[in-house]
Structures are given as structure tokens and as C-alpha cells.
């Protein structure tokens, strides 16, 4: 009841709800492809790699989106370059590049005049989101979802069978980096909602939950977006009522939903599997 009253009275709570739900939906869309491609670590890497861009943006007094997006894309390109030009495997390249970028970000933070806003970027504070940030998040979400819809078939084929995709004449490498660009945009849009530390959880957990419930990509995307939005709403509710960290509350709700699916999913759930073993 207090939450509903707050929504009616406070503009900051309305902006927080809209921003959180938007992030939950678009994270579910991109997260589904990240899960299918086995690129969860890449999502973690890009979410950490944007930190120096955020720090530089604050030091120069410009919108953090510009710096964060630039460094996120640079990290994706750097990981691909190291992987292709050496014997280093992809997971090792990811570890090297994202650690270097994150370390650079920490050093740059120490030079920043104020660490308050940067703290919010690290851990999220959606209750302090501004109107400009809310609209930026909405625009990014619309752009990303529209591009995914346009390139849906290409992403579908290249995610399940890259060799077949190349046989069909698709540029698999271009699709990979294009998806990394979309991942970077989603990561940047989620910074003030759940923060750099927890953004990977909102990308992966709702999508992983949906993966347990269906084998169809379109249905998986719909379920992941729904779980992301529900996690955002419930997490924001507990954050507002009990004065909890908003990002952490959303991630915990998403994790609880995942474990419910992990136990009770009709075909993939742990209890269903045990029951099937007993019957056999």
C-alpha cells in the first residue's frame, strides 16, 4: 500500500519504476542470446570494462553514456583481437582485457573529485535516476529491441549453428560484434539501475530461468523479458519499503525466481528429473 501511495505522490519513484522495468525487459532480450552463445563471461567483462569510460566522463563533465559505450565497444574489440591474433583462448582473453579495463577504472576513480555518483554507478541507485537518464534508457531499449527484431533470423541461425550460418552466406563475425555492440548499449542503460557490479546478473539470470522452461528462442525471449520486468518491480518494491539497495534487491528476486524454475520446471526442473528417475 505504501509503495502504491508513493507511486502516486513521488515523481522519482515513477521514474525508477519505468527505468527498472525497461532495463528488465531489454536485459532479457539480449541475455537470451548471450546464454545461447555461451557468452556469459563476455557480459561480465563488458559490464566491468565500461568503468574507465564512466570515470572519464564524470571527470570531463559529460554524459557517462558516451564514455561507457566507447570503452565497452573497445573492450569487445580488444578481446576479439587478442583471441584472433594469438594462441590465447577466448575466456583467457576476456579475463585479461576486462581486468585491465576495470583496474584502469579504479585508478581513474581515485582522481575523480567526487565519488558519490561513481558509487551509484558501481552498485546502482535507481531511486536517484534523472528524467534524462530514464529517457536515454527507454530510447536504448527501443533501439536494441528493434534491431534484434530486424536481425532476429540472422542471430537465431548464428547462435545455434555458426557453421551453417556461414554456409548461408551470413557474416558471423559481423553478427558477433554487432551483438556485442547491443550488449554494450544494454549494459550502459542498466548502470544506474543495478550498477556495474550486478548488471551481468540482470542480463543472465532471467534468461537462464527462461532457458529452463522452453526450447524455443522466441518464447525464451518473452519469458526472460517478463522475468526481468517482474524482478525489477518486486525488487524496487522491497528497496523502497525496506530501504534496501535497489540493484541488489532486483538481483536477489531474479535469483529466487531462477531457483524456483530450477526446482519445479516441468521438464528441466530438479524435482521433475528426480521423479522421472524414480518412475524409470
Curated annotation (Swiss-Prot):
SUPFAM superfamilies: ABC transporter involved in vitamin B12 uptake, BtuC. One of its GO terms (cellular component) is ATP-binding cassette (ABC) transporter complex. It is found in: Cell membrane. Keywords: Cell membrane, Ion transport, Membrane, Transmembrane, Transmembrane helix, Transport. Gene3D superfamilies: ABC transporter involved in vitamin B12 uptake, BtuC. This protein is probably a component of a manganese permease, a binding protein-dependent, ATP-driven transport system. Belongs to the ABC-3 integral membrane protein family. This is Manganese transport system membrane protein MntC. It comes from Listeria innocua serovar 6a (strain ATCC BAA-680 / CLIP 11262).
Amino acid at each position: 500500500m505504501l509503495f502504491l501511495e508513493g507511486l502516486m505522490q513521488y515523481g522519482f519513484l515513477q521514474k525508477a519504476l519505468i527505468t527498472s522495468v525497461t532495463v528488465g525487459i531489454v536485459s532479457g532480450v539480449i541475455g537470451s542470446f548471450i546464454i545461447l552463445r555461451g557468452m556469459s563471461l563476455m557480459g561480465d567483462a563488458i559490464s566491468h570494462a565500461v568503468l574507465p569510460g564512466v570515470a572519464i566522463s564524470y571527470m570531463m563533465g559529460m554524459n557517462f553514456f558516451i564514455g561507457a559505450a566507447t570503452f565497452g565497444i573497445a573492450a569487445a574489440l580488444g578481446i576479439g583481437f587478442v583471441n584472433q591474433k594469438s594462441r590465447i583462448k577466448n575466456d583467457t582473453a576476456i579475463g585479461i582485457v576486462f581486468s585491465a579495463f576495470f583496474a584502469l577504472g579504479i585508478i581513474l576513480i581515485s582522481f575523480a573529485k567526487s565519488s558519490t555518483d561513481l558509487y551509484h554507478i558501481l552498485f546502482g541507485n535507481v531511486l536517484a535516476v534523472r528524467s534524462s537518464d530514464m529517457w536515454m534508457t527507454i530510447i536504448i531499449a527501443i533501439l536494441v529491441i528493434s534491431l534484434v527484431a530486424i536481425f532476429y533470423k540472422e542471430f537465431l541461425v548464428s547462435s545455434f549453428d555458426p557453421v551453417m550460418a556461414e554456409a548461408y552466406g551470413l557474416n558471423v563475425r559481423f553478427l558477433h560484434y554487432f551483438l556485442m555492440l547491443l550488449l554494450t548499449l544494454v549494459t550502459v542503460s542498466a548502470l544506474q539501475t543495478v550498477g556495474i557490479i550486478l548488471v551481468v546478473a540482470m542480463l543472465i539470470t532471467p534468461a537462464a530461468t527462461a532457458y529452463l522452461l522452453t526450447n524455443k528462442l522466441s518464447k525464451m525471449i518473452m519469458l526472460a523479458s517478463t522475468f526481468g520486468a517482474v524482478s525489477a518491480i518486486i525488487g524496487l518494491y522491497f528497496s523502497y519499503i525496506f530501504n534496501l539497495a535497489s540493484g541488489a534487491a532486483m538481483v536477489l528476486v531474479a535469483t529466487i525466481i531462477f531457483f524456483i524454475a530450477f526446482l519445479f520446471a516441468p521438464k528441466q526442473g530438479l524435482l521433475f528429473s528426480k521423479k522421472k528417475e524414480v518412475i524409470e
